[in-house]
Amino acid sequence: MRRIAALLALAVLAAGCGKGTATSLVPGADPKQGARLIAHYGCGSCHEIAGIEGGGRVGPSLHHFKDLRFIAGEIPNSPGNAVRWIMHPQRIEPGTIMPDLGVSEPEARDIAAYLYAH
């Protein structure tokens, strides 16, 4: 009986493993608000972003953002780096074509959550 209980406990733990959701990757962030902010800041005018109108081709496609190894080809893709990049791309890569848009940290977290979810 103990063996069955132990196996059941392992199965439950294993079921919880794997890739996290966007909200677990960016705790406390709201992907739906991220979509609204992406539209507000006009991100789709330069980037192709799943579920966002525009489909610009100036910046890189952000489809499958969570699968990218690097952000802007420069920094490792992680939620913290994504938030920093969204807030201050010019500080990270001076002269990059992506402008500083005055995105606050909570807004950047929501935008990152949306990108990781799509």
What is each model feature region?
Residues 36, 56-118:
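Extracytoplasmic electron-transfer domains, predominantly the class I c-type cytochrome c fold
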